[in-house]
Swiss-Prot record:
Protein name: Leptin
Keyword Disulfide bond among UniProt keywords: yes
This protein's UniProt keywords: Disulfide bond, Obesity, Secreted, Signal
InterPro entries on file: 4_helix_cytokine-like_core
Gene assigned in the entry: lep
UniProt lineage: Eukaryota, Metazoa, Chordata, Craniata, Vertebrata
Primary location group: secreted
């Protein structure tokens, strides 16, 4: 009886502890991020949207680090309407990728950079409401281009 009580009390203390997140190796982070980006690109390619030959609008300079990458992905996600085709899965995968990158940043970056506004995409709510499908398609196409650029420059994810 005494052993049972002692065991129960010791297990109670363990349940009250919170695990300390371990610093992840940046190589593992880049490998997982690469896989997640590739999955998103496959999903974007598989969906049927008008494919425009858009001139490149992003350069490697736009990948200032993980904070700016996460901010851009979150902005793309906010511009994509739930009402167009099969975008719910794409939005879920974007959220998963941004959550993973945010978690990695939180655990591995000592100094957190503040989020900045993302230039080049419509921000006004009224414009988004009036042209919701056009804004969604534009955001999907821009995100596809951005993800391809990110795939070629995964080292920028290590920059805090």
């Amino acid at each position: 009886m005494d052993y049972t009580l002692a065991l129960a009390l010791s297990l109670l203390q363990l349940s009250m502890c919170t695990p300390v997140p371990m610093m992840q190796d940046s190589g593992r982070m880049k490998t997982k991020a690469k896989w997640m980006v590739q999955q998103l690109l496959v999903r974007l390619k598989d969906n049927v949207w008008p494919h425009f030959d858009m001139p490149p609008t992003f350069s490697a300079d736009d990948l200032e680090g993980s904070a700016s990458i996460v901010a851009r992905l979150e902005n793309f996600n906010s511009l994509i309407s739930d009402n167009l085709g099969d975008v719910l899965q794409i939005k879920a995968e974007i959220s998963s990728l941004t959550g993973y990158l945010n978690n990695w940043r939180h655990n591995n970056c000592k100094e957190q950079r503040p989020r900045t506004a993302v230039p080049g995409l419509p921000q006004e709510p009224q414009r988004r409401k009036d042209f919701i499908q056009s804004v969604t398609i534009d955001a999907l196409m821009s995100m596809k281009e951005f993800l391809n650029l990110l795939l070629q420059n995964l080292d920028h994810l290590e920059i805090c």
